Each structure stands twice: as C-alpha cells, then as structure tokens.
C-alpha cells in the first residue's frame, strides 16, 4: 500500500494511511504539532446543556455502540442539533468538495460559520486515522477559493464518545492537535462550549436559545 496520497485519492484514503500525521502534513507543505491547547469556551448560558446531557446518559445503557451509525445518530447528532439551535449556523452533512486531485472527498459535517469549521467522524474508534483525515480536510479548506479570509480554521475529530480538536493557522501553515480528549457524555458541556465559541462570536448567537 502506498504511503502517500495519489491523484484521485479522497479524504477517506488519508484515514487509511499508516503514516505519522507530521509526515502527512509535510506532503502538502504544512507543519503539524500536538500539544495541550487552552481552547476558549463560551461562558454564557446554553439552556439545552443539562437536558441533552441527561438524555444521552439515559439512553446509553440501552444502546449497543458497536456500529458507527449508532454512534453518529445517538452521540453526534444531538450535538449537531444543539449547535444549530444555538447558532443558526448552516451545517451540511456528507458535504463533497474538490480542491485538487489530492484534496477532495466528503466532509462529514461542514459548518458554514464565519470561519469555516469541520467535524470529521473517526470510523471504528480510530482517532489516528480520523486525525489524518482531518488534516487533509483542513488543508483543503485552507486552499479552497470559497473559504473566507481568516487567520485560522477550526476542526474536530470524534468517535462519538471521544472528541479531539485541532486548529490550522493559515499564515504559518501550522496545524495544531489538542492533546486533550473530551468524552461524551461526561464532558458534554465542555465540548458544546468549545464548539459554540469556535463557530460564532457572542453577538451572533441566537439569544432566544441561550
């Protein structure tokens, strides 16, 4: 199996590559580092937090989380739903883009916030593969003509029960992976506050739902 992306490969191919994230980023002229990031969290009231967290906690004992579909429907979907309610942000699911022959494919959750953001689902609990996929997706957004001018792009990779965040600094071409792992449902509130803060500024929040 080739250890690099070939023409006509898609984002899902980067998921399967067994190479270090640093090497993958360098193929496209970017640097990659992992460190503990102090990501800002929205500090205001989010009035669905307790209700949604309790619902997830209530149904989990009755679910078998042995399929990716189940995790997406019962762990990821409630977060996406609440994000829409809080922010009125347009979120496209399974969104297809093509930037070049080596940067193309499906983005699981494409968020049209003022600074485009993405959420990548890691199949089979494979966070390393999900990180590689997120790297190529962030690079694709950085090079995409439709991406608004901004200093950085925000991304997340999730298995459903575990979330990990990343940033692409556009001027320096540096991709940072947060070493902190957030678990749902225990860290549900932290995940929501990081996502809300990343997507919109406070004056753009849908105040009827906070």
What are these regions (language model features)?
Residues 155, 159:
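Phosphate/pyrophosphate-binding active-site loops
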């Amino acid at each position: 199996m080739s250890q690099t992306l070939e023409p006509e490969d898609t984002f899902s191919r980067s998921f399967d590559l067994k190479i270090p994230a640093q090497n993958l980023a360098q193929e496209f002229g970017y640097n990659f580092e992992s460190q503990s990031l102090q990501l800002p969290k929205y500090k205001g009231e989010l009035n669905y937090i307790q209700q949604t967290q309790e619902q997830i906690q209530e149904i989990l004992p009755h679910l078998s989380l042995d399929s990716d579909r189940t995790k997406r429907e019962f762990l990821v979907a409630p977060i996406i739903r609440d994000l829409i309610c809080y922010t009125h942000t347009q979120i496209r699911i399974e969104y297809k883009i093509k930037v070049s022959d080596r940067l193309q494919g499906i983005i699981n959750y494409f968020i049209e916030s003022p600074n485009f953001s993405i959420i990548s689902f890691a199949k089979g609990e494979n966070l390393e593969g999900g990180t590689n996929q997120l790297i190529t997706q962030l690079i694709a957004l950085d090079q995409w003509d439709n991406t608004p001018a901004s200093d950085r792009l925000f991304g997340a990779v999730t298995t459903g029960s575990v979330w990990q965040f990343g940033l692409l600094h556009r001027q320096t071409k540096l991709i940072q992976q947060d070493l902190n792992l957030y678990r749902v449902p225990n860290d549900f509130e932290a995940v929501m506050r990081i996502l809300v803060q990343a997507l919109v500024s406070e004056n753009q929040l849908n105040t009827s739902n906070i």
